[in-house]
Amino acid sequence: MEADWDELSRIPVPPPSPHALPTVATTIAFDDVMELLWVGNEYGRITSFYGPELQRYTSVRAHPVAEGIVRQILFHERGVISLSSRSVHMITRRGLTQWHVAHEEMVDLRCMSFTAQLNRVIVAGCQKVMFTIDIDKGVIVDKLPTEYNYTMMKKSRYLCAATDTGSVNALSLSDFRVVKSWKAHGTAVNDMDARNDLLVTCGFSVRHLGSPIVDPLANVYDLKTLSPLPPIPFHAGAAYVRMHPKLSTTSFVASQTGQLQVVDLMNPNSINLRQANVSFMLGIDISPSGEALAINDAECMVHLWGSPAKIHFNEMSKEVELADVTHRPPPLDWSPDTPLNMIGMPYYHERLFSAWPSHLVFEVGSPPAPIDTGLIPYLRPAEIGHCAPNPKKTRRYQVENTRAVATTEPALIAPKFLSEKAREQSKKSDGSVAEAAGALAGAKLNGEAEDDPLLKYSNVEIKYSRFGVDDFDFRFYNQTNFSGLETHIANSFTNALLQLLKFIPLVRNVALHHAASSCVFENCLLCEMGYLFDMLEKANGQNCQATNLLKTFSSFREAASLGILEENLTNKSLSSAIQAVNRFFLGQIAHDFRTIMPNSDDLEQRLATIASESIQCRYCGNEIVRPGNSLVNELIYPNMDIKHTRRNPAFRFSNILRASIERETQNKGWCNYCRRYQPVGIRKSVHRMPLVMMLNAALNTPMARRLWAIPGWLPDEVGIVIDGGQTLCYEGEDLRMRVQANMPGLIVYELVGVVTEIDIPEHQKPHLVSFINVAISSPEPQPQNKWHLFNDFLVTEVDKDEALRFNQPWKVPCVLAFQVKDARHAMDDSWKDALDTTLLFRDWSLNGGRPVESRVTLSEDEKPTPGTPMALDTEFVDLEKAEIDVKADGSQEIVRPSKSGLARVSVLRGSGVREGVPFIDDYITIKEPIVDYVTQYSGIKPGDLDPRTSEHNLVPLKVAYKKLWLLLNLGCVFVGHGLASDFRKINIQVPKSQTVDTQYLFFHPGKSRRLSLRYLAWAVFKEYIQEEPADNNEGHDSIEDARMALRLWKKFLEYEDAGIVSQMLEEIFREGSKLGFRPPPRNGTAAVLSRPGTAVTMQNTNSGRNTPTVPDAAGAPAVPASAPTTPGRGFRRADALTPGDGTFSGPGAGDFFGGSPLK
């Protein structure tokens, strides 16, 4: 050690994770090939540092954390070898793993060393066997038994190995037998080093029956003569030792307190002392060049000592491979106006390295095949992992191409958008409308003949164009009169179950009667079902969505805790999830029914199996009886031999149904008489069967699955008799015989439908469909059953055999619904005559907010009747922005449209004395996060929908929706602008016969443009709407918009009666094309649209509105005066208002709106 040696660097040992504390270095070693210092820690990680500055180079987790600390590091020309208690690991110096060796007999490895063969290492420890490992192959080549527990090894003339008792054995390098053994220290050897013919050891001894202390002597042995030499005295306590790599008799001895001594073994009096600034030293190592010394301490630091003038770890080191220096491009002044070609591309004159020739591209290492989710219910713990019976979905020895892109795209090719079809038809010859209708009627799934029967079971997905969902061709998937349900809504996996419940007449009747009652509870699932069922019936084959119902379903904390929401289904199969949802739905609608009719047992008669459970202790015979009513019965399958199922009547569906309804189970429960847990028997006795029997298939075993695969196993009719506390079930010929014999008490059920999980193993995600016999719920008797498949919005007719056949592995029954045969066609529509309309005639508010002054609640003599016109306008806020996928070519595809929430509803009287006066103006409270209030268009500002801060009349969505639903079922006609979009966002289905949309009234057949309400107001009345002063950003006013739509409709009726509709539309569109279909600025002047040949002038009134003044039209046909409409008069689209002054009747109405251009 030269005189200028000093501490050059000090770095902390890197922590095991970014947020963890530093850890101590358990071993340090200098690399003999490159300028690297390697450090191992207590978490199995080894890290290298480059050069005297100790720059971090590589870091690798070589051993699992459970194996503890890294005990030793060795260096080979090919890589770095590390040792932990249970494994040996080799990596390249860049960090790539070469091999990892572990063995069941490796229980406590402590040390390793090279052998006489430089491509082999021997590893040993406190265990009874040593291993020889081939470095080139990374395999164990020999196992050697030993009677010693070795803790340290150093290779020289002999293989010197220290034991856990303080001895040191000299082992032969050829056969590893013990040649010589010394008792070096009393307790343990702490450190040792061997070089050439010398061995130096440091250790602990026990003195005066105390704890072990460091020996003040470092023992020296001559390996040539196998004899001890005089020890080296070191009063500070010799804890660590290293031999100098160049000076054969010089060694470094260090104490635990940091004192360093460089001593000549042949001349102990020649010493050189240094003091390292450490609190507690844990180890030292000297570089192969002898110019650097590394120290690790208990404060998680690594110190590097050496001469500042010269320091190299090796004499001849290989160059360390470092990352290429990235040359930064020249700075560029980047702005939105900078063209992209300014970036440029690099110049190259040779073939690019990335241009691989095809003959050099190979597929290596295919990814593993994905686990079939259908196996999850059948998994059972095994000795290693889990196991399940082979579903045999592939042929023997068939290899799956796992490199195929695992897309979840639907197998059905989506049809063209309606706008694309319109453009194509417009380019064809005349008669394009008829050709388009014929092409649409002949369209088949996938655009061709339906050769593959699995196509209709595939996933269906809505595609969106820039025109939104209205541009999607739903009729491509549904040519029936039964509506499907859309899929882009959270928890829409329940669509199949909702369809099944809708086609059960007795459930449908209960839901609709409850919806027509006085229930205004916000989270009433039964009301939402009634609204949905009514919407599906009114749609008559048009697509619908269960948005409001699923939003209510998502709001239940019980559903979230049960894990049946879509966000919790990652590790649950759809079949088990939908069965849990079935139990939750029926339990919740029973609760909702009791909130309005607590004393009625109507729902229990329809859905509940009335039963009692007797629990008997098998030890003392004590018996307890308690109610055992259930809304859902779960099928229980017996243990069976599948070979005998076909001819064993005990395995028929009727017998399994009987055993499931009247079940007997054995369990362990608390006995009050014995005062301990005892084996108990539980028996269920049925007293009354429901009118609707809901069953969960509960297919959890392969044997039960094979039972369902038997053709015809599921009957479409079953009979049940309760006789003397016993339940008897019949099917097939047995049932027909008892029906003919008029068996007393026999209840015949017919199968309404089945919810089925479809899991086609061709990169399709599992989904649910339902098979339903729609003939049962038809209002008129039908001669035969008609089965339909409901696959979300794909609806098609199927035959009965296909619906009830479950021998395909991808088709799993989940939920079954049976209804008494006497209730076939029992569609009760008396709820329409018993609507509770109280909500329309009284105020309802969450916050006591004041409605607008112009709003007047309906009076009793204003009760709406069929045909009563009502002007409607709504405002919405954005709850979610649209999800857009930008493709590589720059094109954009809407994956999921923006989600809107109803924020305001305004309804105005369309006739009578108070014509044009609003009676509904409700703001709707929204609990979901609002991402954009779109105030410019909605007029809704932050705080308007919060009950704590809003000054408006706030109501729940349920109340606002129910008011509109009541008006709809009272037969009112809704007048508005763009009503289709409003109805869709409100999630209500209004027949076309009850809709007057001015967007379609003022539509020119030869023009592909729909006019805005703002432009129409100016074009027809020369009035400006949807405008506010420049310093105000209030946005639209729904009352103003609804009132203008009502006026436009009545003006259109005037045009229609005068026979000038086409001329007026031509004039409106001609003027609009000049102005860009926008109103001109207020300070501009323009001619008022009038009948051809009529001169019109414009005058600016003090009111701020441009009111036209029209002189008498010469030669114009006489127009009779009109009489005001009244609520009692029947509504007719053409003659609800005859041409007249174009104003609303009632006091002051003329001053409010101004005159008509036709006056």
UniProtKB/Swiss-Prot annotation:
GO CC, any one term: P-body
Keyword hit for Metal-binding: yes
Catalytic activity, EC: 3.1.13.4
Activity regulation comment: Positively regulated by the regulatory subunit pan3.
Pfam families: PAN2_N, RNase_T, UCH_1
Cofactor remark from the record: Binds 2 metal cations per subunit in the catalytic exonuclease domain.
Location within or outside the cell: Cytoplasm
Polar residues bias locations: 1096-1106
Cofactor: a divalent metal cation
Subunit-level organization: Forms a heterotrimer with an asymmetric homodimer of the regulatory subunit pan3 to form the poly(A)-nuclease (PAN) deadenylation complex.
Name the UniProt record assigns to this protein: PAN2-PAN3 deadenylation complex catalytic subunit pan2
Taxonomic source organism: Aspergillus terreus (strain NIH 2624 / FGSC A1156)
